[in-house]
Regions:
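A short hydrophobic beta-strand segment most commonly corresponding to one strand
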Residues: 34-36, 81, 95-111
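Short acidic-glycine-tyrosine-enriched beta hairpin
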Residues: 69-85
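Conserved short histidine dyad/triad with adjacent acidic residue
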Residues: 19-21, 35-50
């Protein structure tokens, strides 16, 4: 079935944020992964390097992002492009939550500050 209903999504928690997975190999996608992230107010993101290009579309709130040391704020309707290999961090410095839709390709992984590789379950 080409429709993945919200009730069929998989919810994951990490670093205080909620990742709701919709498209991934586990859900029948062969090339793309897509999820919604919700970051509570006052949450500082964990900087990490990404193995694949990542696109974030901000749905609500203000997302503070850092890409290879360049910092900026993205609000509803804005898009953040994160190149493969970039050092990336996303934070929410406001009081309310921020939500974004994230898309990348299958095989996405991150390198955490301690040097360990992490393949997120919402992208597998």
């Amino acid at each position: 079935m080409p429709v993945i209903h919200a009730s069929e999504s998989a919810v994951h928690q990490m670093h205080g944020s909620t990742f709701t997975a919709y498209a991934s190999p586990a859900r029948g996608s062969r090339e793309l992964c897509a999820w919604r992230i919700e970051i509570p107010g006052g949450t500082e993101g964990v900087p990490h390097h990404v193995s694949r290009e990542e696109v974030l579309y901000v749905l609500g709130g203000t997302l503070r992002v850092s890409v290879d040391g360049e910092t900026g704020d993205a609000t509803a309707g804005d898009v953040v492009l994160v190149p493969a290999g970039a050092r990336f961090g996303a934070s929410n410095l406001a009081a309310g939550p921020v939500t974004a839709w994230v898309t990348t390709t299958v095989g996405f992984a991150g390198v955490l500050p301690d040097g360990s590789w992490f393949t997120p379950p919402w992208a597998t």
